[in-house]
A protein has these predicted regions:
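Gly/Ser-rich catalytic/binding loops embedded in alpha/beta enzyme cores
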Residues: 1-138
């Protein structure tokens, strides 16, 4: 959905800290992404996949994001999702949002990964990212 425009600067800072002997925690320098309905206070929007929330900048990190950053993890970006985390209707394709389009499997572009956290799952499943956060609304965690 979107990449953190500051990710390279953040990673360079963490690399310098490690070289100086400082390690923030067990996830120091490990990249992760979050589903685009999870708040992160940086230069990315939190839109839940909807054009209606374009420009939405939240005032603070979600608690889980703050904890991961404190442990040294690097927020690489936001993953696509089913618009509004699947809370619109049951009559549309899972993994689709107006803003991000249809999420596809990295191994078979004709396959819908399913669930509202499809972008997070597809990214981890394709080994594009070490780990990702999703949310359970209507089948994502199954």
């Amino acid at each position: 959905m979107q990449l953190n425009p500051d990710v390279m600067d953040i990673a360079a800072c963490l690399d310098a800290e490690r070289e100086a002997g400082k390690v923030r925690g067990p996830l120091h320098g490990i990249p992760f992404i979050v589903k685009d309905n999870i708040a992160s206070k940086d230069n990315m929007e939190t839109t839940a996949g909807s054009w209606a929330l374009l420009g939405s900048i939240v005032p603070r990190d979600a608690h889980v994001v703050a904890q991961l950053r404190q442990a040294g993890a690097v927020l690489f970006g936001k993953a696509t999702l089913s618009e509004w985390a699947d809370m619109r209707s049951s009559n549309y394709s899972e993994g689709y949002s107006g803003r991000g389009g249809q999420c596809r499997s990295a191994y078979n572009l004709t396959v819908n990964p399913g669930g509202s956290s499809s972008g997070s799952g597809a990214a981890v499943g394709s080994n594009a990212i070490a780990f990702a956060l999703g949310t359970e609304t209507d089948g994502s965690g199954e």
